[in-house]
Amino acid sequence: MRYMVIVEKGEDGFGAYVPDLPGCVAVGESRDEVLRLIREAVEFHLESMREEGAAAPDPSSSSEYVEIPAP
């Protein structure tokens, strides 16, 4: 499966979350670190769901950029 991950840069590092998996988040000092950690978080999240007998949700989120004219 392929889930969309949102990565945000903060003052002290990076944060990431998966819109299709509420509560699945990670933080790291670098973009590479947060991407590694969110992969681990997704695997753990899905494994926990399987253990509880829940089906993994189909990926359904998408993203788009909108362009607006500069003032």
Which stretches of residues belong to each language-model region?
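Short, surface-exposed helix/turn micro-motifs that flank interaction/cofactor sites
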Residues: 17, 35-36
